[in-house]
Amino acid sequence: MLQIAGTLFLSLTFFPTTLIAQTAGADASGSPASAPVSPQAAPQPVSCASTPGQRTECPADTSRGVVLLRSRGDAPCLLGRTWGYDQASVWVSDGCSAEFATGAVADAKPTKPKAPTHIPNAGFLLVDDEKGQVYFRLFSYGRYLNQRNLDESYVDAFGNTKTIQRRQDIQLQKFFAPFSGWFLTPKMRYYLYVWSSNASQGDPAQVVGAGNLTWTFNRFVSVGVGITSLPTVRSTEGQFPYWLGVDDRLIADEFFRGSYTSGVWLKGEFHTKVKYQAMFANNLSTLGVSAAQIDNRFDTQSYSVAWMPTTGEFGLWNTFGDYDDHQKVATRIGLHYSHSLEEKQSQPGTEGIENSQIRLSDGSIIFTPDLFGPGITVNEVDYRMMSLDAGAKYKGLSLEGEYYWRWLSNFTGVNTGGIADITDHGYQVQASAMAVPKVVQLYFGASQIFGQYGDQWEVRGGENWYLMKERGIRLNGELMYVNRSPVGYTAYPYPVGAKGPVFHINLELNF
């Protein structure tokens, strides 16, 4: 499906590719947004409106260019993201409503559209001039976590009994402050941030300064370099933090996925309804791993493609749930494939803020000495993973699911010749409903892992109360029951081996 495996590129999942795109000077096909036209032609204003989750096409003669005259809606009109044009029409989507000029305007001088002062998931505009733009955003949340009703210990697949630390505490869990924008040309974009996980204080990579740089050619292709999330599963495609829960994945998603790493990537669309990402990277997770610990083969790859057949979108930033209140059924099908040769030395710490250690389905880290028997130590393993996701949204309701497959093979190390290939698979499913539009959202999730070293599962239910009737501030409560979690670290609601109920309350700020 993807013909780009040999091109050293990758997907930009954390950086909003349409940020201040109306200043980019490029239309959907790469033409100037305010192209010079013949002074003899008369203005041809076109009004075009859309609602959240809807795409509207307005017939127009666009052969001589299109100019955004004025925005009339509440949602920002961002060129290439929420408005654009093709050979036969001007289109708007996701609440963008505006008036456009097509054809020539006598003696008109190209004007620079005013950048929006605020863009969701990009933040507030600090600087806007001919040299560049700077947006600032803040994401943070406070969490009360109660694990006191979990079992005190568990027995792994090899008969070892391990004690579980059961927490009850309050944390300002995470602090995330990115700066983003462009410099000298809107094609040259940056996304740089400081990230702190306070529950992991004292651990490696508890505070991270990172980011990426991107050159955007047009809506079909952007090339980036730096740190971003591998597009191994849907939740690492770039819609964070717009999940149903606050910064917590279900156990199957957490178990199978990759994490944040350094590399190069390619991102864009084959068609308005088909998006793609691809990345070549150092390893599955770079947080807390120095360059001296990484091998020199540059052999981690991850690819994804998403098809949105009905509406060409799946909500703002491709979010989970239908806060956007689609009036037409929105659908999505996504496919991901990843491969990496992982070394023992290049693994993040077990309490890393975005830990994605390779574990067996009982929670054991595969590189643990003597795990498979006395004198046996795995130093390297071949990791392959694939996932298929699908979902539908309509009038505040959503149903979304994903199935995962993982293959571990080619074990190398001390006395590893007798270790057979390991295959695991699993799924997650999530359903949600806006009980009170724009205010109260209810959701349910279930997840299961089928592994050679144990089958684990969880169920959870929760609510989101949007205090100001819009995204940005929400109070979240979530009750979960897990059976032998194979994943866990201080920034995650579960410890490894957890069995029993867990409850947490979160107050989230995101602008």
Where does each model-flagged region fall?
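N-terminal secretory signal peptides that target proteins for export/translocation
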Residues: M1-L2
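Bacterial N-terminal signal peptides
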Residues: A5-T18
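N-terminal periplasmic/intermembrane-space "pro-region" immediately following the signal or transit peptide
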Residues: A21-P43, G103-Y141, R148-S153, K273, ...
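Extracellular, modular beta-sheet/disulfide-rich ectodomains of secreted and cell-surface proteins
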Residues: P39-V105
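Outer-membrane beta-barrel pore domains
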Residues: K112-A115, N149, I164, Q327-F511
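Outer membrane beta-barrel
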Residues: G123-N149, I164-T286, Q293-E313, T319-Y323, ...
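Short Gly/aromatic-enriched secondary-structure transition segments
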Residues: D151-F158, W265
